[in-house]
Regions:
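Short, small/polar-rich loop/turn modules that mediate ligand/substrate recognition or access, typified
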Residues: 171, 176, 231-233, 239
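Alpha-helical segment proximal to the catalytic Tyr-Lys
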Residues: 124, 168-169, 229
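Conserved glycine-rich Rossmann-like NAD(P)H-binding loop of the short-chain dehydrogenase/reductase
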Residues: 20-37
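The beta1-alpha1 cofactor-binding region of Rossmann-like NAD(H)/NADP(H)-dependent oxidoreductases
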Residues: 32, 53-65, 101, 214-215
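Catalytic Tyr-X3-Lys loop
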Residues: 97-116, 131, 135, 159, ...
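Conserved glycine-rich cofactor-binding loop
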Residues: 6-8
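Active-site helix of classical SDR
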Residues: 119, 155, 163
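Substrate-binding pocket helix/loop in short-chain dehydrogenase/reductase
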Residues: 90-108, 190, 201
Length: 245
C-alpha cells in the first residue's frame, strides 16, 4: 500500500513496486483520474494494482481503505507512508514568526495522522505474521531547517521521531520501519518553486542536479526489499549530497 500515490513520489513508488512484483493499493485523496491512469499503466505492464480513495488523516476512512485493500489484494506486507495530509500549501515558504501557532499545529497534526492511522491498522497484522516493512517518506529539512520552512520542518521532524520509536517497538517481531528523507524533488508539488531557486539548489548538490520522484522510489523499494533486512530505524537522505557540503 502506498498512500498519497496518485502523483509524484507516491506514483513513482507504486509503479516501481508493481514492476518488482507487488500487488499495489494506490491510495489517493482527490485526484481520481491520476490514480486510475497509474493503475491502468501498471496493469498494462502486467502488474496488479487497485486505486482506492481515502483521506488517511481520517481514522474511519483509513480503516475503510485498509479493509478494501486487504479484501481485494491480501494482507499489507509493505506500507509506504507517503501522504502528508495537507497538500502543497505545507511546502510554501512562510517565516515562523509570521506563522500562526494553530496553522503550524495543523500541519504537524495532519502529518502524524497520515502516518499513524495506516500504521495502527496494518502493523499489528505484520507483527502477527512476523514480517513486514514500513517506509515513511519524510524530508531532509527535518534535520536541516532552511528559512521559511519551519512548519514543514517540524512536521517532518515529528515523523522522523515516530519512525524511530516504532522501529524499536516492532523490531523484535520481525517488522522493519525506515524513513527516506528527500531533498528538493521536482514533482508536481514543486511547481511553485521558481526556476532560479531550482537552479541554485541543483548547484548546491554534489551531483549538480535536482532529484526526481524516481530517485526516491528506488530508495523506498530498496528499504522495502529483503536486501535491507538488517536495516531498521534508518534515515536515508536522498538529496544528491547536499547535506555533506
Amino acid at each position: 500500500m502506498v498512500t498519497g500515490a496518485s502523483r509524484g513520489i507516491g506514483a513513482a513508488t507504486a509503479r516501481l513496486l508493481a514492476e518488482r512484483g507487488a500487488a499495489v493499493a494506490v491510495n489517493y485523496h482527490t485526484d481520481k483520474d491520476a490514480a486510475e491512469t497509474l493503475v491502468a499503466a501498471i496493469e498494462a505492464a502486467g502488474g496488479r494494482a487497485l486505486a482506492l480513495q481515502a483521506d488517511v488523516t481520517d481514522a474511519a476512512r483509513a480503516a475503510d481503505l485498509v479493509a478494501r485493500a486487504e479484501r481485494e489484494l491480501g494482507p499489507v506486507d509493505i506500507l509506504v507512508a507517503n501522504a502528508i495530509g495537507v497538500g502543497a500549501r505545507a511546502g510554501r515558504p512562510s517565516p515562523l514568526l509570521r506563522t500562526a501557532p494553530e496553522d503550524a499545529l495543523a500541519v504537524v497534526d495532519a502529518q502524524l495522522r497520515a502516518f499513524l492511522h495506516p500504521v495502527r491498522l496494518v502493523v499489528p497484522g505484520m507483527v502477527e505474521r512476523g514480517r513486514g516493512t514500513v517506509v515513511a517518506v519524510g524530508a531532509s529539512l527535518s534535520r536541516r531547517s532552511p528559512e521559511g520552512f519551519g512548519t514543514l520542518s517540524m512536521a517532518k521532524s515529528a515523523l522522523d521521531a515516530a519512525v524511530r520509536t516504532l522501529a524499536r517497538e516492532v523490531g523484535p517481531a520481525g517488522v522493519r520501519v525506515n524513513l527516506v528523507a528527500p531533498g528538493l524533488i521536482l514533482s508536481e508539488l514543486a511547481t511553485h518553486i521558481p526556476e532560479p531557486v531550482r537552479a541554485a539548489n541543483a548547484a548546491r548538490t554534489a551531483v549538480r542536479r535536482n532529484g526526481t520522484p524516481e530517485d526516491v522510489a528506488h530508495t523506498v523499494a530498496f528499504l522495502a526489499s529483503e536486501e535491507a533486512s538488517y536495516l531498521t530505524g534508518g534515515y536515508l537522505l536522498v538529496d544528491g549530497g547536499t547535506a555533506m557540503l
